[in-house]
Amino acid sequence: MSTMKIIFAERLTYLMKIENLSQSELARRIGISQSAVCYWLYGKKEPSIDSLWKLADYFDVTTDYLIGREKD
């Protein structure tokens, strides 16, 4: 698994935990499939740019944070 996928999965897991969100609830709130969230968390697929934007907007973080280009 690439470093970006690992960092993304770790950060998404962290953000979901803070918000107490399940995979299905996050998927519903940002308009994607639950299977997409599952694939991201297990490093099977990378999110699209559109999905990254949705996640960044939802969690109020930058896309750079999500993919590990900035620390905080």
Model-based region annotation:
Residues 17, 31, 42-44, 71:
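Residue-level detection of the helix-turn-helix DNA-binding "recognition helix"
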Residues 20, 46-49:
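Residue at a beta-strand N-cap/secondary-structure junction
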Residues 20-39:
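Short alpha-helical DNA-recognition segment
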Residues 1-21:
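A short, Lys/Arg-rich alpha-helix, primarily the initiator
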Residues 50-65:
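DNA major-groove recognition helix of helix-turn-helix/homeodomain DNA-binding modules
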Residues 15, 49-50:
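Short, Lys/Arg-enriched C-terminal cap helix and immediately downstream tail that follows
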Residues 1-6, 39, 67-72:
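Short, charged recognition helix plus adjacent turn
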